[in-house]
């Protein structure tokens, strides 16, 4: 999973978005490829953010580049794009966008960029740090780590149930022998199984 660039733009509907700042992480590309990759990244980011409506969160896959451009534009016309590979989680990319917008406003009030008509480079030191931090979404985003732990737990439970079946034991047989289940619970399980079979035939 990779984040290739973070871009900030002034977006006015009907006009070409004005670049305010963009940072790149292109270490996975060869030295001679990086210039072209930067140009393509800027092009994809600008085109996608320019087609994003105010308040929308967009994740657009670009088949030619095999990248996903995640964008949003806030009510003041400040747009942010995060260009990632296709494996990068969209929710984490949009969390990164929100943080980038906040960091940009801390150092560049709206009055500083609102009147700009051509591309500039308004330095925002936090963008470089965020670009590096979010290369690993699991460590950067606590929810991602929680989701990973939950997925691992579900996998363990599935494996445990599959292993029971591999030993030739059916869950029904184990339930029938169990002292943990009352007569009513055993009857409920049998009834539920019959109902599921019945529904399966419909």
Swiss-Prot record:
Transferase recorded as keyword = yes
Alphabetically ordered keywords of this record = Coiled coil, Cytoplasm, Cytoplasmic vesicle, Endosome, ER-Golgi transport, Golgi apparatus, Lipoprotein, Membrane, Methylation, Palmitate, Prenylation, Protein transport, Transferase, Transport
Q: Which residues form the propeptide?
A: 200-202
Query: What SUPFAM superfamilies does the record point to?
Result: SNARE fusion complex, SNARE-like
Protein topology in the membrane? Lipid-anchor
Q: Which GO terms describe its cellular component?
A: cytosol; endosome membrane; Golgi apparatus; Golgi membrane; phagocytic vesicle; phagocytic vesicle membrane
Describe the location of the v-SNARE coiled-coil homology domain by residue ranges.
142-202
Q: Which residues carry this modification: Cysteine methyl ester?
A: 199
Lipidation (S-farnesyl cysteine) occurs at 199
UniProt GO MF annotations: SNAP receptor activity; transferase activity
- Pfam families named in the record: Synaptobrevin
Tell me the InterPro entries matching this sequence.
Answer: Longin-like_dom_sf, Longin_dom, V_SNARE_CC
Q: What is its EC number?
A: 2.3.1.-
**Lipid group attachment sites (S-palmitoyl cysteine):** 198
Q: Indicate whether Ribonucleoprotein appears among the record's keywords.
A: no
Limits of the Longin domain? 7-129
All disulfide bonds of the chain are: none
> Which subcellular locations apply to this protein?
Cytoplasm, Cytosol; Cytoplasmic vesicle membrane; Golgi apparatus membrane; Cytoplasmic vesicle, Phagosome membrane
User: Subunit details for this protein?
Assistant: May be found in 2 different SNARE complexes.
Role description? Vesicular soluble NSF attachment protein receptor (v-SNARE) mediating vesicle docking and fusion to a specific acceptor cellular compartment. Functions in endoplasmic reticulum to Golgi transport and in early/recycling endosome to TGN transport as part of a SNARE complex. Has a S-palmitoyl transferase activity.
**Family of this protein:** Belongs to the synaptobrevin family.
Could you tell me what this protein is called?
Answer: Putative synaptobrevin homolog YKT6
Tell me the organism.
Dictyostelium discoideum
